[in-house]
């Protein structure tokens, strides 16, 4: 099956950004807009989960490569709180830590070392939009590497999560006979 390539995101800082997501094959490639190429891959033989665009949240079954360099990818399992759906990247190449955390039903915020970089929206189908903060949170501007990480995480895992009360109610109802 060919990867799904959507109309490129029109990023306000970097121009056209392509996200090619293939749920069945477990691959995502982010490119264009002067960004370093980002690839997220699901390990062969891993049964895909339909509610995760890349197919799994198991860190042992995923790899992240940006500009040819393997980075540490740590998606949380996701359960009762929005924060439990966070995805962390520890970047040896950049010497920093990125975190994508849901902050509403449809959006997630990307931070670098605790400083807000921007807010992403993705419905989990490979289409992604970004709204950047002017200073990138820590006084450093948002760079192409930051954008590549953000687009890759948003496209691979989707953005947003239900509020805690609804997640809790759904968990209780799932246990009800």
Regions found by a protein language model. Name each.
Residues 1-29, 103-177:
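Low-complexity or membrane-interfacial segments used for flexible interactions
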Residues 54-56, 81, 100-103:
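Low-complexity, polar/charged sequence tracts that form flexible coils or short amphipathic helices
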Residues 77-79:
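Surface-exposed, interaction-prone regions used to assemble/regulate multi-protein complexes
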């Amino acid at each position: 099956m060919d990867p799904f390539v959507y109309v490129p995101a029109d990023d306000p800082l970097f121009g056209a950004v392509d996200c090619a997501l293939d749920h069945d094959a477990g691959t995502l490639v982010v490119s264009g807009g002067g960004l370093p190429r980002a690839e997220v891959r699901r390990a062969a033989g891993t049964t895909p989960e339909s509610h995760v665009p890349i197919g799994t949240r198991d860190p042992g079954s995923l790899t992240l490569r940006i500009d040819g360099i393997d980075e540490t990818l740590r998606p949380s399992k996701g359960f009762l709180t929005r924060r439990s759906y966070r995805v962390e990247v520890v970047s040896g190449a950049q010497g920093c830590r990125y975190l994508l955390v849901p902050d509403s039903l449809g959006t997630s915020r990307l931070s670098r070392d605790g400083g807000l970089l921007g807010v992403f929206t993705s419905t989990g189908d490979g289409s992604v939009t970004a709204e950047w903060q002017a200073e990138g949170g820590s006084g450093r501007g948002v760079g192409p590497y930051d954008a590549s990480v953000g687009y890759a995480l948003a496209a691979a895992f989707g953005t947003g999560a239900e509020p805690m009360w609804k997640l809790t109610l759904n968990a209780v109802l799932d246990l009800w006979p």
